[in-house]
Amino acid sequence: MEPVIGKLNDVIWIVDLNRQSLDRVIPGVRANDWKNMFYANGWNVIDAKYGTQLETAFSSNNGDLLKTWIDEMPNQRYQYLLRLDQNNLRSEVPQGFKHSKELSNFLNDYSDTQLYKMFRNLGGHDFDKLRDAFNQSVKSSSPSVIFAYTFKGWNLPTLGLPRNHSTLLNPEQMEKLSQKLNIPKEDIWAKLPESSAAGKHCLQKGKIFSKTTKLNSKHIDQINIPTELSRPLPKFDISTQDYLQMILTEILRSNPELAERIVTTSPDVATSTSLAGWIANKNGLLWDDQEENNINNNMDLNQFHNEYDDPLQWTSSPKGKHIELGISENNLFMLLGQLGLSFERHNEILFPIGTIYDCFIRRGLDALFYGAYSNSQFIFVGTPSGITLSGEGGAHQSILSSSIGIELPGISMYEPCFAKELEWILLDSLNKIKLRTGST
């Protein structure tokens, strides 16, 4: 739960909550624990547990019995009832319930077909309930999470099967499903009729998402990225790690158009991965909370840094160019993946640079994979690397990074030995991001 997310009002997460794992029916679902976690972090929590049919039944006289029965029912029992047809469901309903007689009397007002449909009416499959949930989330001033309760295999003959994760429909079942969905047998890939409301909507959205975004020359022409820096190399021995900081500060000094669009991020290791100079040179942290910014920027904190000869003062503002994350490499690569698609999403070029201890790249591998898969354009620097951390033991050794860089498609991997080499690599990578022609 990164603190910065709690300040966003245009974030909607959907938790697809059903009673099955991949292998079995889950004995207990800790939904309330998950909801409380979001509550504690200031999120707007929306429950889409029951559909409108069930909620209408709950609100009628003695409808609370139906709700109590469903809420208290073990998952295994619930899954069993899902497999019953509408002719056999009613006789099984009251069993094991302390108010079975009263519940049976209540359900007598519903036909077998009505009871069958109502029992399956969960919020995650009820469009009216979902529309209401989305409307609530749009009006919220904080990020929202929707818990949508669903069935695995909805509207399929495999609904409720304990092992339906790897189950495929047979040809006969596929044919019945096609008939149910009015899909013509001679054209199984037929689109929705373009004259229908749904067809028009899909056509409009398809044009938006399939169009090729053109480079905005107004922004691009102003950014000149040289092949090397005009500043000479230092006359003393210097590590590539330290020279990274010099490259960034030189770009800040000599190329303000480029520096304006560079955004850096790190999972709580900015100082030890050589971003201190970049942050301290008037860039600061990106933070859009004026009250907290006033606290961060007060004189007492600055005096503390001065007293301990700390060049890095963590000033923050809505114009900051560094995003400081918690210790989560997965969050780092998720953020870089989104920043690296800023042009494709918003027609604005950004140059994202993330720094990370090289040995911990593997911790965020899944998010890195999807960033590269999405053709996101960003730079990440594994530093310190190699045997630099030998004193910290085997768990801090970069034994997989080279393999990841070589084997993962969509990634260009470099291992610079010299400071000048690092300069060439970094500038060339920035230019590829500008032209959208390179890899991650």
Predicted regions: what is each one?
Residues 103-124, 128-132, 139, 193-440:
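Thiamine diphosphate
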Residues 14, 147, 266:
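Generic enzyme active-site microenvironment
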Residues 17-235:
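Long, well-ordered, tryptophan-enriched scaffold segments
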Residues 1, 17, 150, 269, ...:
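Active-site metal-binding loops of divalent metal-dependent hydrolases
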